[in-house]
Amino acid sequence: MDKNYLIVDLGTGNSRVALVTSTGKIIDMVSFENEYKRDDLYEDAQYFIPGDWKKKILDGCKKIIDAHKDVKISGVSSSGARETIVCYDENGNDFIGLPNIDNRGAKWMDEIHEKSYIYEKTGRWCTEDFPAAKMMGYRKMHREDFMKIKKITSLSEWIGEIFTGKIVIEPSMACETQLYDIDDHKWSEKICAIYKIPMEVLPEVMNASESLGKITDKISNELGIDKDAEFIIGGADTQLAAKAMNVKVGDICIVSGTTSPVITILDEKYYDEKERCWTDLNLGGKTYQVETNPGVTGNNFQRFKKLMFNDTSYEELDEMLAKKKDFVCTASFSSLNFSQKKSLKKGGFVMRAPFPQNMDLADYALAVLSDIACSIYVQYQNLREMIPNSNDYILGCGGGFKSKYLCHAIADLTGRELRMYEGFDQATVLGCVKLLNEHFGIDNKASTSEPLIYKPNSSPDTLIERYFQEWRVNRNILNP
């Protein structure tokens, strides 16, 4: 018998609440924008007020539940953006959130020694991107508030605490803190000492698909959910998206959203002496996810489209781009040269002078999407250089793949089929559904629909290949 689930999916820019069946059918969905505040004591620091976010989340849940009063909800789960933590005080109050876009620790990274050791044990560079550095930076300028921290957790497990009152963390999120030893699968006392973070603030680790318990009476009464509904632990958004697409050991998958991680799954931990990748724990911590990442990609096009093509559908824009036989400018807006651990601070459009006479707005759109395709392709090349892969296909998922032009461009550059399965644009939500089904003993039936396949162009001289050659030169000029 089918069950119905409530899924909370917290992203970086936007979040959503979905009512979904155990077969993956989305009954209803509510989206909202995430709001951040600046901390002017730092050069680049942002935070959020958990109470403000919580109100939006619960309002979204209630709106959906009220609209579908005849739907019995059996389970609740959550997906969260990585590298973000929520901090609790001694009374269990969530008083501040430090998001992935917060870089408050940057000024003090030179104080951290044994960087190679930290990379080897955590699978991550020793940079301000991760919660260990965020907490260090918080301690530097807000010592009294830092001393109030009695527990932390990730975004996805913060939702679990809202619904059950219990604070835990999933392995796929624990490794994102840079305080978790992915060899020994436990919190690292040595790394905590390096960052001067007390071990006591770190929560119990529980695996995805395990039950955190029944939802509290308070939440049940407030939202109108059945008191027997259980909260089932979710995890990191990238890993959940990969789960939805049935990414197996040896597959390569591009998860295109705010950023576009290029990932592969391995049975054993991978360590790169040149530090050209991140090694993550997969859901449950039983396998490893190796990742390269071009940085911000999807957000760039989302903002561009809102500014220049707000009333144009993706289908209409693809029709415009299909008529283009050449490019007149290149774009550079992706934010990372990943293999060199280098942020790309300068971006823009590069074209020949004087200003081209035959240029229109669609040329800019082509340039931005081509920038995303080329940036992903470079990361695909880097990943295959480290971990050889002879598959004739790549899997893809995420909202970033709404553009057919982008899909064709990636297939042409890589020379591989790009395959996307039903629900690819809602992959994190469907990943949660699969976890819930596993917990309730419901078979996760493989999709009977054929995948959407983009085949590479056999022509040796495609537009995107010509673009790539010039793009590479121009990006290096902008970021020497």
Predicted regions mapped to residue ranges:
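Structured loop/turn residues at beta-strand edges in well-structured enzyme cores
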Residues: 71, 200, 389
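Gly-rich Lys/Arg/Thr-decorated short loops/hinges at beta-loop-alpha junctions or inter-strand turns
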Residues: 35-44, 117-118, 168-175, 198-201, ...
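Active-site core segments that coordinate phosphate-bearing ligands/cofactors
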Residues: 6-7, 112-125, 136-154, 160-166, ...
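Short beta-strand-loop/turn "lid" adjacent to the catalytic site in phosphate-handling enzymes
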Residues: 65-100, 125-129, 156, 160-181, ...
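Short, acidic/turn-prone active-site loops that include or flank metal/cofactor-
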Residues: 32, 37, 99-105, 174, ...
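Short acidic-aromatic active-site loops that bind/stabilize oxyanions
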Residues: 43-54, 124, 128, 205-209, ...
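General small-molecule cofactor/ligand-binding pocket signal
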Residues: 30, 200-206, 230-232, 419-421
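N-terminal glycine/serine-rich phosphate-binding loop of ATP-dependent small-molecule kinases
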Residues: 1-97, 120, 148, 220-221, ...
